[in-house]
Amino acid sequence: FDRTLAIGCMCGWDTDCNVGNISTIMGVRGGLNAINYRKFREPVNDFLACSSVIGSLNNMDIPYGALYITKLAYALAGETPPEPWKDIIDSHIDACHFEFPGSTHAMHVKTDDDALKQEGSSNIRIENSSEAAHTGARSLKFTVTSVPSGSNVYVYKKTCYCPDDFSDDRYNPCFSPFIYPGQTIHGNAFIPDYSESDAITAGLYFHDGYSGRVYYGDSVGMKKGEWASLSYSIPQMENVLIDEIGFVFTGINTLRPAFEYAGFVDDFYIDGCPDYTYDMAYSKEEKWPGLHREISQFTRLTGH
């Protein structure tokens, strides 16, 4: 796999069409074991920034994309997908279910502490794990070291992107959120016995990209070794842009000022009907490369 991609890059100097095609062929041929996880999959973190006119689909994670294509393939073949994929496809095809080995669904981790905010450092780690699962066989495990007692740990997903989120956007993506006021966030959380905390609460939250305000749902006390089902029904709202949703964990250790934090999340999804109003005066002009301009939350094609 590695050598084939290297040859494709060096011979053609075209890393999207040529190498994208041969990497697909070689990936199917060799399977996951042929792909170096640390080199290729971990940096990508399951995130695909697409460039279609459908803004909510441009923020795509690889498991969702894989099941989206799989659903179409089985429909064209007139066949029924096997379980557990049929249930996932029929219920919440875009859910963060973590059943694909190594999948992260483009989830991230951050904390309130500025010194720990840089994801990818030795202090913060996420990984797909078969150690615990709410349903199925896998979940997402997060570990944060040196967490100050009483601070928040956020395990989250970006639901909308803007130009400032990119260092290279030459393919001119455009985005609209895939969650709106009126809908409900669902998620499941688990704290293992070995997590170094005396008391932990967990809840769900969302971030308004316009005001910068964070809205929190009700938190629950976590019992180590038990899954907790969480939900947050977002009320009707006006003039907001929900660009981030996730879990918020707060842990206290009475013996240490800082400790190691470990937990799992699973079955993270959105349902319900949007209920919101929007005044275009609150919109922002997004400036992409060249002459490409978009109105925040909206996408268009040749003026439409």
Residues covered by each model-derived region:
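Short carbohydrate-recognition loop motifs
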Residues: I124-D165, H292-H304
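Extracellular beta-strand ligand-recognition surfaces/modules
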Residues: G187, S229-F268, M280, H304
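Catalytic phosphate/nucleotide-handling subdomain of diverse soluble enzymes
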Residues: F1-K71, A75, F190
